């Protein structure tokens, strides 16, 4: 990995100087430039997207410095390494090739000297055949009935990605109902199974190793539920596996012909493009799944080929670094103005926070600057009635992404116009706010007494100067959803390179798993291991109050 001392670079120092200057300037002042929107926005007619970043606290000098920072970090060089199969996840000695899963060209991609594209295409073909058979009724359960309900059992990337996509594309769904079970809490699977018929239910068990504690625990519960009603032989007709462990899959009772492979070069949080996306294909159809891949591939090419100054994920990343490292922003809100995208913020939480929640840099040293932000959000307008108060008038500095669509999949009265009126109003209010004079004038016009005006005015001031990006698609389709997901994937990648951290490992999830395995026997009355005073007493209370 190439090295450069981050805080000692002229780009970093230039941005520090620019911050000291621009923090004194309000967006009201910056918008006196009538050409500002044209300077700081991108329109792509082929995809049908407008990316407006003009409501960010930047000027031309800021933007130039941010682009120079990206260049100095050699983002394109690392991107080419990723796309070509080099092992950029060096702590696990793995290639990072989720982009190969949606490679729509005929270009070969090599890992350890082997072209992986034939295998990827073979799995896609297998997914197509299976999903078509399931949806048409050719695949039937043990009782000869068509499958009406699919239950995906997985966790992390084997759950969040396909669940988010199925929810986002619900309008297009014309296949079986799809449910997702992830939590080891028995309530999760109980609430799903109680409304299903074993004879018409198919389970998709998604676990690369087929040993993941939560997933296998839930899968065994599902198998018992099925076999209690239909017998052991029914497993072959009602379970398929997304895994690489043939031995464990066969031991479970699943025919290895019904096992869909994926690879170590695909990280869990980037895996929805792989066989992990099987529930998507079952739900909306394989053709729609391919459209999803097409949209992501379009952004892959944009990311690789567009100049930094016109590169949407690069600009998103650079602005995030600007606020994180120079303005002290510790969180970033993602606010989709579409109920279909209500699971998108939770999906991005894993994608971003598991990727860039790191403290160790390329050289194995602890960083002395902020890295990944806290990602959170809610679909509009629900969030307006809960946490927007804090964004507008609280003490935290929170950059926001507003995601919207010109044309909704459904058309019900003027619902969409009312939704989008709020979308546009919020970014305007956050940017420009209301001054003391404007508040007093409005109160006076409303007939409020001078005494009450004096009391109310400070509470009704909106400082504004809250930065936002507006990501506005012409419509929500499988293709534009794929593009949206890929935009954020490449934003996350770019920030990881700018911060000089590995965005593709996740060692922080391991310690808790190890300790849970130590504690589990204690909750079943076995050996009492040595713990701190707090943990020891909590376990004692748990055991003494069990029924």
UniProtKB/Swiss-Prot annotation:
Can you say where in the cell this protein is located?
Answer: Cytoplasm
Q: Might you give the EC number(s) for this enzyme?
A: 5.3.1.9
The protein's annotated pathway: Carbohydrate biosynthesis; gluconeogenesis; Carbohydrate degradation; glycolysis; D-glyceraldehyde 3-phosphate and glycerone phosphate from D-glucose: step 2/4
Protein family:
Belongs to the GPI family.
Q: What are its GO biological-process terms?
A: gluconeogenesis; glucose 6-phosphate metabolic process; glycolytic process
Gene that encodes the chain: pgi
Function of the molecule: Catalyzes the reversible isomerization of glucose-6-phosphate to fructose-6-phosphate.
Annotated catalysed reactions:
alpha-D-glucose 6-phosphate = beta-D-fructose 6-phosphate
Matching PANTHER family: GLUCOSE-6-PHOSPHATE ISOMERASE
Keywords (A to Z) from UniProt: Cytoplasm, Gluconeogenesis, Glycolysis, Isomerase
Q: Name one GO cellular component term.
A: cytosol
Give the active-site positions. 354 (proton donor), 385, 513
Say yes or no: keyword Ubl conjugation present: no
Q: Does the keyword Isomerase apply?
A: yes
Q: Kindly name one Pfam family recorded for this protein.
A: PGI
In Gene Ontology terms, what is one molecular function of this protein? carbohydrate derivative binding
State the name under which the record lists this protein: Glucose-6-phosphate isomerase
Q: Which organism is it from?
A: Endomicrobium trichonymphae
Q: List the transmembrane segments.
A: none
């Amino acid at each position: 990995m190439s090295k450069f001392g981050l805080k000692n670079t002229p780009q970093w120092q230039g941005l520090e100087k620019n911050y000291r200057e621009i923090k004194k300037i309000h967006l009201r002042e910056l918008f006196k430039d009538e050409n500002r929107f044209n300077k700081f926005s991108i329109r792509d007619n082929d995809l049908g997207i407008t990316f407006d970043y003009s409501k960010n606290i930047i000027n031309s000098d800021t933007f130039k410095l941010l682009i120079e920072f990206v260049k100095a970090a050699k983002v394109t060089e690392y991107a080419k390494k990723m796309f070509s199969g080099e092992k950029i996840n060096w702590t696990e000695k793995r290639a990072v090739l989720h982009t190969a899963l949606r490679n729509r060209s005929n270009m070969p991609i090599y890992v350890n000297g082997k072209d992986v594209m034939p295998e990827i295409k073979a799995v896609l073909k297998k997914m197509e055949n299976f999903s078509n058979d399931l949806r048409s009724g050719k695949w039937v359960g043990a009782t000869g009935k068509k499958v009406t309900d699919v239950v995906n059992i997985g966790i992390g990337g084997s759950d969040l990605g396909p669940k988010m996509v199925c929810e986002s594309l619900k309008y297009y769904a014309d296949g079986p109902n799809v449910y997702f079970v992830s939590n080891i809490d028995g309530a999760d699977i109980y609430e799903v199974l109680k409304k299903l018929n074993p004879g018409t239910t198919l389970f998709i068990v998604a676990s690369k190793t087929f040993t993941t504690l939560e997933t296998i625990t839930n899968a065994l519960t599902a198998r018992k539920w099925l076999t209690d009603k239909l017998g052991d032989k029914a497993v072959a007709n009602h379970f398929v596996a997304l895994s690489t462990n043939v031995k464990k899959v066969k031991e479970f009772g699943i025919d290895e012909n019904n096992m869909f492979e994926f690879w170590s070069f695909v990280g869990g949080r980037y895996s929805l493009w792989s066989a992990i996306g099987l529930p998507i294909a079952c739900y909306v159809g394989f053709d729609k799944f391919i459209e999803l891949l097409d949209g992501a591939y379009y952004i892959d090419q944009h990311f690789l080929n567009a100049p930094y100054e016109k590169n949407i994920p690069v600009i998103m990343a650079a602005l995030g670094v600007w606020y994180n490292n120079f303005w002290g922003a510790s969180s970033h809100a993602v606010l989709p103005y579409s109920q279909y995208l209500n699971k998108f913020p939770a999906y991005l939480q894993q994608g971003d926070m598991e990727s860039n929640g790191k403290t160790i840099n390329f050289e194995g040293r602890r960083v002395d600057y902020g890295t990944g932000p806290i990602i959170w959000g809610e679909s509009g307008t629900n969030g307006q009635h809960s946490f927007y108060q804090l964004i507008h008038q609280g003490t935290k500095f929170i950059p926001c992404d507003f995601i919207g669509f010109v044309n909704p999949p459904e058309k019900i009265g003027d619902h969409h116009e009312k939704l989008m009126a709020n979308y546009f109003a919020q970014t305007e209010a956050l940017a420009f706010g209301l001054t003391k004079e404007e508040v007093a004038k409005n109160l006076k016009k409303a007939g409020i007494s001078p005494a009450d005006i004096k009391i109310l005015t400070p509470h009704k001031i909106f400082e504004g100067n809250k930065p936002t990006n507006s990501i506005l698609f012409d419509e929500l389709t499988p293709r534009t959803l794929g593009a949206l997901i890929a935009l954020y994937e490449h934003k996350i990648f770019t920030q990881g390179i700018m911060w000089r951290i590995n965005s593709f490992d996740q060692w922080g999830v391991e310690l808790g798993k190890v300790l849970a395995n130590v504690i589990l026997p204690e909750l079943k009355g076995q050996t009492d291991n040595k713990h701190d005073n707090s943990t020891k007493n909590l376990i004692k209370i748990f055991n003494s109050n069990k029924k």
